């Protein structure tokens, strides 16, 4: 060894691999295990949400006020406990988001006004054709219609309507909280932000499969799910509520409408404007810093266009 000299000793010291501390190697699970934990957590949330709807056994139809009230109770309990699942996921994976869990889930004030208005405006543009059809078929003019919509008595009547509360308030709020705000942060470090946005509807479909059992009819999913990537929950909730109110576009009825050509032009114009305005109205610069991007940076996930 002495014959090697200083240069030889340095060469041996460089070529010898350094042992990693066992504590560092065991501090967090590998990426494969993290993905399994994320998928299992999301699947558990979806099953819990659906299971809460069937806790109350009843022969009454799902639109009966008594059934709706019971389901309100169960889904509100599950939704209020769902952030605990994200907290448990963080502890199991060792991932540190770099921000509070509430901020990560879209509960923040920065950029809240554009996050509430711009996604809803974009969704209304997409529904330009159905909105035109609704106005054409309305027996009253626009002024009288606005008076009816804004009247306090009309709102008081809605707030006592269980089906309206379910479709416009409880379902959008609880579903977006569970299937967007809680699931996206858990899936994003595993799949990346873009694939995570398109993976969430798979779990969302689990929650809506029970409608096929109860009633064979199509129910649209929320158009506003992608806007959670703006870092706010309020946008997806409002868009979800609006889509529930509008329902699926009645294209067949538009084809048989007396004014079908203006209506079809409205449908085409709405889709065209939606595609044209989608990128500028969902620019992350409008909504402030994105907590999900901070999460991806801390986990070393590949960058997405939203975070660049």
Swiss-Prot record:
It comes from Rattus norvegicus. It is a multi-pass membrane protein. GO terms for biological process: CAAX-box protein maturation; CAAX-box protein processing. Keywords: Acetylation, Endoplasmic reticulum, Hydrolase, Membrane, Protease, Transmembrane, Transmembrane helix, Ubl conjugation. Pfam families: Rce1-like. It is found in: Endoplasmic reticulum membrane. The keyword Protein transport does not apply. The modification N-acetylalanine is found at residue 2. Deubiquitination by USP17L2/USP17 negatively regulates the proteolytic activity toward Ras GTPases. This is CAAX prenyl protease 2. One of its GO terms (molecular function) is endopeptidase activity. The record marks 240, 244 as: Transition state stabilizer. The chain crosses the membrane at residues 25-45, 75-95, 112-132, 186-206, 233-253, 262-282. GO terms for cellular component: endoplasmic reticulum membrane. Protease involved in the processing of a variety of prenylated proteins containing the C-terminal CAAX motif, where C is a cysteine modified with an isoprenoid lipid, A is an aliphatic amino acid and X is any C-terminal amino acid. Proteolytically removes the C-terminal three residues of farnesylated and geranylated proteins, leaving the prenylated cysteine as the new C-terminus. Is able to process K-Ras, N-Ras, H-Ras, RAP1B and G-gamma-1. The gene is Rce1. Ubiquitinated. Undergoes 'Lys-48'- and 'Lys-63'-linked ubiquitination. 'Lys-48' ubiquitination induces its degradation. Deubiquitinated by USP17L2/USP17 that cleaves 'Lys-63'-linked ubiquitin chains. It catalyses: Hydrolyzes the peptide bond -P2-(S-farnesyl or geranylgeranyl)C-P1'-P2'-P3'-COOH where P1' and P2' are amino acids with aliphatic sidechains and P3' is any C-terminal residue. The keyword Aminoacyl-tRNA synthetase does not apply. Its EC number is 3.4.26.1.
